Amino acid sequence: MAKARTKFVCSACGADHAQWFGRCPKCHEYGSLQEEIVNAVSSGTNHRSLGAQKSRSSKVKTGQPQAALTFSQIRQENQGRFLSGYGELDRVLGGGIVPGALILIGGDPGIGKSTLLLQVAFQLATRLPRILYVSAEESGQQIKLRATRLGITQTVEPSQAQDGINNLAHDGNLFVLPETNLDDILRELEALQPQVAIIDSIQNLYFPALSSAPGSVSQVRECTGLLMQLAKRDHISLFIVGHVTKEGAIAGPKVLEHLVDTVLYFQGDRFASHRLLRSVKNRFGATQEIGIFEMVQSGLQEVLNPSQLFLGSREEFMSGTAITVACEGTRPLVVELQALVSPTSYASPRRSTTGVDYNRLLQVLAVLEKRLGVPLSKLDAYLSVAGGLEVEEPAVDLAMAIALVASFRDRVVDPTMIILGEIGLGGQIRPVSQLEIRLKEAAKLGFKKAIVPKGQTGIESAGIKLIPVGKVFAAIAVALPANENTTDQGNGSEAKIEEDLGKKD
């Protein structure tokens, strides 16, 4: 009788090792090796057929081998995308749910992943004949209780429900299966043939042919691979919920993200009600696209005008505040940057950021001190994005600089002005992408002026007065003019501004 052996699998890259290492020899990640017990194959087993045995045991029919085709011979089936019923989700997915797509969604515990997918399942059930919701974490009664609390359930008569399946949705189109055994889940998928299926969650499923525990690297990799085979073969769109680690990455091997077609992260601040659905990988649409939801008592609701969510009141504009337009994927968002510069009580001044890159703040502070002579090196500097949004693109550099100088001088920037531009180390203003889209979004909210990079010409201004600048000091002179009683900020040309400033470089 063959003995079971032990192997150590890296939770980061999925590599197998015969012995334990403190650091994975392949991906160099520390403390990532996990012990797994592997049942040895008996001497009478054909090693070459082991994979086929797994496929047969999981009821996934591999079919006949296919011959290679030329590109023109490939038949394109006329299968349109499914609309989820939520425009924000459809936007992130690139226009809807692609048949046969494998979509992975991750997020912190309690952020609302299951709530979002349950609401999506009910919406899809009003459009499609069969939707399957597989729960490995809740019973059918618990799911029904949650749906009732959210006010989205329309229960059918028990006599109309199929045996062994909790049927909750309108016209019986939504089927709920509380199960953790992958064999049973695959069997139900083949029998029911739903258009869309939801698996909650992949870390709680187990494949009986493997002896490792649910959630291990081998189990996650094998379960995802078999689900992918079935989804591609039968054109079933699959949503898979994934747990995240304490660092915020999806738990399991990186191969999990390589297998799926789309990777979505559901993000949010526990002190805020809004949630961001962000795509980091999408074979059928743009990456870094975001959808915005708000958590209310009845579940998640779409935010139709997200710029209003992240923009504070302009009636009481305070010093150190500047408005800019950030682009997340193809979506423009008008955001408010708030800066505070104050004397320090420590030997080393403090720098703190919320929603922007810390190193970006240090770079902007260095440019202001070196190129403009603004003495900020011995002052505390705090920078925050209102509303809890995280902005990573460099197009907000100029707004950061003006907000910092406005706080230093205790001055108020014109609340009808937006500020766009990337700052180079020499103090020059560099062009930004998608400028026309940003201006159109600002025009919708009533902004009248825009400080923009000087080199970007021939663009649609969308009714906004454009003030092109080439240097940081010119932009600050426009946003914070020397004459505080000036009513029309930004009438001067850059040449006149340079002359007034002594052509300081």
From Swiss-Prot:
Annotated CDD domains: RadA_SMS_N (cd01121)
Biological process, per Gene Ontology: recombinational repair
GO molecular function: ATP binding; ATP hydrolysis activity; ATP-dependent DNA damage sensor activity; damaged DNA binding; zinc ion binding
Enzyme class: hydrolase
EC number: 3.6.4.-
Alphabetical list of Gene3D superfamilies matching this protein: 3.30.230.10, P-loop containing nucleotide triphosphate hydrolases (3.40.50.300)
Chain sites annotated for binding ATP: G107, D108, P109, G110, I111, G112, K113, S114
Annotated segments matching region Disordered: 485-505
C4-type Zn finger ranges: 10-27
RadA KNRFG motif (motif): residue ranges: 281-285
Keywords: ATP-binding, DNA damage, DNA repair, DNA-binding, Hydrolase, Metal-binding, Nucleotide-binding, Stress response, Zinc, Zinc-finger
Annotated region (Lon-protease-like), positions in chain: 380-505
Ranges of Basic and acidic residues composition bias in the record: 495-505
Described purpose of this protein according to its UniProt entry: DNA-dependent ATPase involved in processing of recombination intermediates, plays a role in repairing DNA breaks. Stimulates the branch migration of RecA-mediated strand transfer reactions, allowing the 3' invading strand to extend heteroduplex DNA faster. Binds ssDNA in the presence of ADP but not other nucleotides, has ATPase activity that is stimulated by ssDNA and various branched DNA structures, but inhibited by SSB. Does not have RecA's homology-searching function.
NCBIfam families reported in the protein's UniProt record: sms
Family in the record: Belongs to the RecA family. RadA subfamily.
Domain notes: Has a putative N-terminal zinc-finger, a middle region with homology to RecA with ATPase motifs including the RadA KNRFG motif, while the C-terminus is homologous to Lon protease.
Protein name as catalogued: DNA repair protein RadA
Lineage of source species: Bacteria, Bacillati, Cyanobacteriota, Cyanophyceae, Synechococcales
